[in-house]
Swiss-Prot record:
The lineage of its organism: Bacteria, Pseudomonadati, Pseudomonadota, Alphaproteobacteria, Hyphomicrobiales. The gene is murB. Belongs to the MurB family. InterPro entries: FAD-bd_PCMH, FAD-bd_PCMH-like_sf, FAD-bd_PCMH_sub1, FAD-bd_PCMH_sub2, MurB, MurB_C, MurB_C_sf, Oxid_FAD_bind_N. This is UDP-N-acetylenolpyruvoylglucosamine reductase. Transmembrane segments: none annotated.
Amino acid sequence: MKQVNGQKLLDSLGSGVAAIRGRLTPDAPMDRVTWFRAGGLAELMFQPHDTDDLVAFLKLVPEEVPVMVVGVGSNLLVRDGGIPGVVIRLSAKGFGDLELAGENRIKAGAICPDKNIAAMALDHGIGGFYFYYGIPGSIGGALRMNAGANSGETSERVVEVHAVDRKGNRHVLSKAEMGYGYRHSGAAKELIFTHAIFEGYAEDKTKIRTDMDAVRQHRETVQPIREKTGGSTFKNPDGHSAWKLIDEAGCRGMMIGNAQMSPLHCNFMINTGQATGYELEYLGETVRQRVMEHSGVKLEWEIKRVGNFMPGYEIREFLGRATA
């Protein structure tokens, strides 16, 4: 694993860090953060105490230093060479709030698990949130990628999103300003979402519970929920199901090292042991190539891949073609 010099970066931020209340960790292992349990080090990890602390810290970080944010670590593949700059990891204490915000409205912090908002909606007879019960991860990620499942998606429920930009300025975005599309948000990539307001509608609790039970049963039956996985690996292309294309290309159960396309649901990539970020990404790229050769359809990654390759293990060079 490549060693980085996070302490040097931390020292370069100057005396202003003394006023920061959150936790700063140089050379932080990302394999302890992601659901894949793989990947290199973050040069410097910051866990802000709250939004005010996040704002204060961002004002200290020079513009040339890269900054990225992670939530619970689902839907994220970190390369073995690690992540340069600052990784901001939001904590439940400062960003996990969940409360009613008016009639049929819910306020949820960015690190709040998706399934928790579904549970609160059930408790209060608010319809439209059942689908979150089957989505791994947190609200921040759902806002960023317009997460959805079982005929529901985030964009249908969002009213407004609160965020902080790279310079520490606060923003409030409407649903229109989020620019939602399929598994995509057009909001600036530099924005760090802190919380959002969602709106549903009055619905009978028995109906909500029935819908949530159906989501749970489906997920437990067809998804490898007890494995080390980041969720769906590829987006569904227009007119196709990614899993079916993968299956037809003969990639169900395919393995490279300790990385495998799940035999249970072949659009889920799993770490069967001590898979490296390289093995996971190489497997994904091999599947993309085979699907293209078999059906002529280009699969797009749904998993977010970040960080640097280890020298000599660049996926682009190894496959001899563009990766994405």
